[in-house]
Every structure is written in C-alpha cells, then in structure tokens.
Amino acid sequence: MKRIVFLLLVVVVLAGCKSSKHLATSEKNVQVSSYLTSKLQLTIPGKKGGSMAVGGTMKMKTHERVQISLLMPILRTEVARVEVTPDGVLLVDRMNKRFVRATKDELKGMLPKNAEFSRLEKILLDASLPGGKTELSGKDIGIPSLEKAKVQLYEFSTKEFSMTPTELTSKYRQVPLEELVKMLVAFL
C-alpha cells in the first residue's frame, strides 16, 4: 500500500510535466467549468510480474486545489490522499497516520522545470473533454521508468461541489520530505 501512495504522489505531481504534442485544430467554443470530479483507477506493476490496482476519486477546483483520494477495495475507505495546490503538495498516509507537506520550492529539485499546477489542471481538464486522453502512463508524464504504471480517469462531472483544505488531527505525524524521497528511490 505504501508503494501505491508514493507512486500516486509521483504521478500526480509530475503530471504537469507532460509535453503537449498535438495542435488544437478545432475552433469550437468549449466552456470550462471551475469544478471537475472523476473516478480513477491506479494500476501499478508488481516487481515479480502481475499488477496491483486501486480505485479512487479526483476533485479539482480550478486555480485552487486538486484532491486525489485512494480508496481501499470493497470497504471504499480512504487509505491515502494527495492534495496539490499552486503552492505545494500534501500527501496523507491514512493507514500509517503520517503525512508529508512540501512547498513548491522544496519540490523544485525533485521535479522537472516545467512542473506547474496549471499543467496538472490542463491535463485533467483535457481528459474530461470528449476524445480526451483519460489514461496516463508514467511515460506520458515524463517518467519513463514508470512506463507500465497507469492512471485511468473516468465518470467526469463538472457539477459544483464543496471542497475544503485537508486538515489533520494530532494523531498524524509529519515525516520529512527526505524520508519520502528515500522511499521513492527505493521503489523506483
């Protein structure tokens, strides 16, 4: 489960790094909503073959935040949450009661130069459009070593919803960003 949580962080944070290789050929006026939700399926290859999949949800309020919740199969209880804002990232491991909070500046050394919140928003909004790319691989977002990992987005909605910043109780302990980096390096 820890591998899933940390892989999701990498996939989400680096999703803004995907290069755009297609030109807009349509001149249709598409109204973009300030709100977007979808279900998601994260599939991670196993080290010894096979793969592991976990479902979840994605909520986005344009120019404000993206929240991704990974849900335990069958019980549908949240096991992890990733919250991305223009200023930073919060990763919450609900199973082990710990979290990492990193600012954009702290993440600069880990991320490609063009990793921006606005790029993540664009990828998610584009996926919600008819004919949009709804399955993203590690290669698509600039991480060739995670080529077989996939995030599938589906059942999009642009209905308005309420979303508040994630608040954590004293039961959760903060772990340093370096601990997260070590875990990611071991995983990759």
Q: For the regions a protein language model found, what residue spans apply to each?
A:
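C-terminal motif of bacterial Sec signal peptides marking the signal peptidase cleavage site
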Residues: 13-16
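Bacterial signal peptide processing site
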Residues: 18-21
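Short, solvent-exposed coil/turn segments at beta-strand boundaries
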Residues: 32-35, 59-66, 83-88, 133-142, ...
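An acidic-aromatic
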Residues: 65-115
